């Protein structure tokens, strides 16, 4: 997904195979979009484009953007008919207005929410809609706390490593309203998310949390991964799978005329 401020390194094939729940769980927010035939829809942080393809299958004319060239290349391989490109969501400007802007599991990678809101507003026609879901307040709090504690125990300062923006409803609604949107729906909810198999936590840390480990030796990283697993196991492991403590923020908004 688009990560305009993160140094996270994306492995597109691994993402598709081991973190495929990201797009699979996007069905609910996609149903809120209700794309119509002929509509122009921009997908911000499209990743490997599974949801972009579903929007296009409804008859919409889609454009998908993501900061990661690896993700775009993987999406283009899977869906060569789609218009996908590597773009920064902070600076992207559309040549033609869109009827809708969509985003799933991406906006929490973009700490400058105001810059993203400017992009969304500039992309939409008046009356156009914005539908998004991403990490909300206290998303993956247990994973983050365990990681930060373990980094500290191994002599690493955890400050400044967290790459994510997890706002409350009020915080994010205020951003959208400041940029000319009328918020029509805002939900914050828990979504406990199973991670694949015995290596689920390690795979998640490898794919999602590079920023925490940019200066950590391979030896320390292996020990930290094991310690994080051990800390999470009592409360976040069921029936052979680790459970990530996801909390999501879902919003719908309409761009108001100036």
Predicted features by range, described:
Residues 42-44, 48-92:
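Class I SAM-dependent methyltransferase SAM/SAH-binding core
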Residues 165-179:
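Short alpha-helix
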Residues 90-101:
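A short acidic, Gly/Pro-enriched loop at the edge of an enzyme's catalytic core
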Residues 1-39, 50-54, 71-74, 78, 131-154:
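Conserved class I S-adenosyl-L-methionine
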Residues 100-114:
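A short SAM/SAH-binding and catalytic strip from SAM-dependent methyltransferases
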Residues 114-129:
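A short glycine-rich, Lys/Arg-flanked "PGG" loop and its adjoining helix->strand segment in the class I
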Residues 184-239:
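C-terminal helical/coil "lid" or tail adjacent to the Rossmann-like core of SAM-dependent
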């Amino acid at each position: 997904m688009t990560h305009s401020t993160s140094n996270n390194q994306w492995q597109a094939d691994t993402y598709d195979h081991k973190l495929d729940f990201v797009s699979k769980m996007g069905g609910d927010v996609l149903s809120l979009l209700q794309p119509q035939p002929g509509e122009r829809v921009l997908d911000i942080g499209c990743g490997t484009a599974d949801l972009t393809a579903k929007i296009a299958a409804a008859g919409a004319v889609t454009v998908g953007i993501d900061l990661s060239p690896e993700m775009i290349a993987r999406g283009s391989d899977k869906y060569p008919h789609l218009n996908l490109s590597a773009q920064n969501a902070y600076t992207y400007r559309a040549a033609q207005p869109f009827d809708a802007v969509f985003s799933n599991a991406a906006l929490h990678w973009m700490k400058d929410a105001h810059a993203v809101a400017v992009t969304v507003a500039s992309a939409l026609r008046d009356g156009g809609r914005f539908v998004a879901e991403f990490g909300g307040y206290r998303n993956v709090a247990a994973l983050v706390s365990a990681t930060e504690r373990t980094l500290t125990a191994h002599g690493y300062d955890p400050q400044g490593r967290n790459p994510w923006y997890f706002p409350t409803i009020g915080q994010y609604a205020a951003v959208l309203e400041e940029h000319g949107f009328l918020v029509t729906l805002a939900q914050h909810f828990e979504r406990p998310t199973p991670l694949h198999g015995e290596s689920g936590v390690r795979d998640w840390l490898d794919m999602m949390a590079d920023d925490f480990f940019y200066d950590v030796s391979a030896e320390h990283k292996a020990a930290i991964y094991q310690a994080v697993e051990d800390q999470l196991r009592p409360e976040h492991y069921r029936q052979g799978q680790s459970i990530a403590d996801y909390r999501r923020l879902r919003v719908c908004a309409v761009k108001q005329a100036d």
